[in-house]
Design a protein with these regions (language model features):
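Interaction-interface detector
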Residues: 1-140
Length: 140
């Protein structure tokens, strides 16, 4: 009955879908991301509702958050928008992307991985070479 009411409200455009939610496996790895209701719509805790419905841990994520910065100037939410394969860190309340290379380090403020040395900023294109632990120029 409740789900039918929600569907009727959606079809009548009285209720808008705007929030995003990540579902986690038992190791806090993101296995799915959906679009859903805004927290508080109809007085419901949607994180809890979606989690119980699927039998998984569910965490809201912000499409506009990357590197602990909100694109529209709002408050950043959980450091980064969740993607499949990201890890949810409950101590930091953050989504962390997969580590791209063994030598890279986690920036605990942005929860993004950084190379041990900065990429040159000279207008050229580079790629990371893990064997030499250095940036290599892309020959075009």
């Amino acid at each position: 009955m409740f789900i039918q009411l929600l569907q009727a409200l959606e079809q009548s455009h009285l209720l808008k879908i705007m929030a995003h939610y990540a579902f986690l496996d038992q190791n806090n790895i993101v296995i799915d991301v959906i679009t859903g209701k805004n927290e508080g719509d109809l007085g419901i805790d949607w994180e809890q509702h979606y989690g119980e419905f699927r039998g998984l841990i569910c965490k809201r994520t912000s499409y506009n958050t990357f590197g602990n910065v909100h694109a529209n100037g709002g408050a950043p939410y959980r450091k980064n928008y969740a993607g499949i394969g990201f890890t949810y860190d409950p101590d930091r309340d953050a989504f962390i992307p997969p580590k791209p290379y063994p030598s890279w380090n986690l920036n605990t403020n942005t929860c993004l991985w950084e190379a041990p040395i900065q990429c040159p900023n000279d207008g050229q294109k580079y790629y990371w070479d893990e064997t030499s632990l250095s940036w290599k120029l892309i020959n075009t």
